Regions:
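Nucleotide/pyrophosphate-binding catalytic subdomain
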Residues: 1-171
């Protein structure tokens, strides 16, 4: 959505759904082209998989997605998976891409899930506090609520809380 916002300047005021659909349609094309170019430099083919939360709700759609990505991986094609924001209904959208990545990792029986962030990790205090440090290892079941702020970056819908919740679900 953000990528498309920089490209398109609507002639009239749009409601939030129309904006999301317009910007995501344009942004998705930019995004997949960028991934294509980056991976092509290493002779690695990529393919686009657009999904919705509804696609995880029925066995038929779930298995179809899994089969698609399995065939891609068997043929050394990297699936670039993203929510299909152009048709996603607001009430049924993923919390964020972390939730989507967790569902994909579980679906594909992935050996690992790497969740990226603009924060170095979970701190034992406020990340802005110079006396705080990253917690290097977290025991399974440890309560992290005292360490995680519910804030999120201006770039997305989630935050560190969502990341840790997804990590716990996938690890179980």
């Amino acid at each position: 959505v953000a990528s498309g916002r920089s490209e398109v300047h609507p002639q009239k005021k749009l409601d939030s759904v129309d904006q999301r659909q317009l910007f995501s349609a344009v942004g998705q094309a930019k995004l997949i082209n960028r991934y294509y170019e980056l991976f092509r430099e290493h002779s690695i083919p990529v393919g686009q998989v657009l999904t919705t939360k509804e696609s995880f709700g029925t066995r038929r759609h779930y298995l179809n997605q899994k089969n698609c990505m399995t065939v891609m991986l068997e043929n050394n094609v990297i699936p670039i998976v993203n929510e299909n924001d152009t048709i996603s209904v607001s009430e049924l959208m993923f919390t964020d891409n972390d939730e989507l990545s967790g569902l994909i990792a579980s679906m594909m029986d992935a050996q690992a899930l790497i969740i990226l962030s603009n924060i170095d990790g979970i701190y034992n205090g406020s990340p802005a506090d110079p006396g705080s440090s990253v917690i290097r290892e977290i025991d399974h079941g440890k309560d992290l609520s005292n360490y995680i702020q519910a804030t999120k970056s201006s770039f997305g819908r989630g935050g560190m809380l969502t990341k840790t919740n997804i990590a716990r679900k996938v690890a179980d």
